[in-house]
Amino acid sequence: MPRSGTTLTEQILASHPRMHGCGELPDIAMLSRRLGTDDPAALRWPASRSLLAPGVLRESIDRYLAAATRHAPATAERLVDKEPLDFLHLGLVALMFPRARVIWCRRDPRDIAVSIYGENFALDEALATDLPAIGHYIVQQERLMRHWQSALPLPVMECRYEDLVADVEAQARRLVGFTGLPWDPACLDFHRSDRAVQSPSRWQVRQPVHARSVGRWRHYSGALGPLLDVLALSAGDTTNPQASTPSRWTSGA
């Protein structure tokens, strides 16, 4: 989800001398719309998978890699695409890049919702400005990610924002290890990087890690009833894989 720690996660990984942070590339979503046919009335991906003409998938892979590597240094062995809405297209990603690895950034959904609500996102108006709609989207994102975990061969690592800011070195080592590259201490100096960051968190990643945004939703708890109602209707692990009971995330605790 947007506002779940994707920028911090990318900044840590992109500080590794053998990785390149691509930012939020629109190419996977664009390829998903384009694949299969140019007829707007015909089947769209993934229903159009069986209609793929020979060479179309290879062309799509080449097109994506051209965009992803446009500014990558010659030393880059891993590419990090932090587009959060690519979770919608992981089936296509698995087809294009069967050796890809997925980092699922997790965060208290109440903090995600408050953060989205407070940003001027160029998203669907309801998603950006309606708390119940944001809550519903968070729940459905969780359901789809659980589906991908069971249906796709891609390895998925869950990285919780709260764990990351509580012990950045331990989680950074975990992240780098997941990519298959050796640890490099430069990943802890991510806030000194001069790479361009275009997300709303661009100023936060110029500072050392802090936990000031954890539990920020509590400042607005009196106005979050509709959001909490939506989250309370979800399954017990939908909003926090480590919570023992649903109430931990849907009550005022």
Task: Please name every model-derived segment.
Residues 1-97, 101:
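Phosphate-binding active sites in nucleotide-utilizing proteins
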Residues 11, 23, 78-83, 101-106, ...:
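Short beta-strand segments
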Residues 26-28, 109-112, 164-165:
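Conserved nucleotide-binding/hydrolysis micro-motifs of P-loop NTPases
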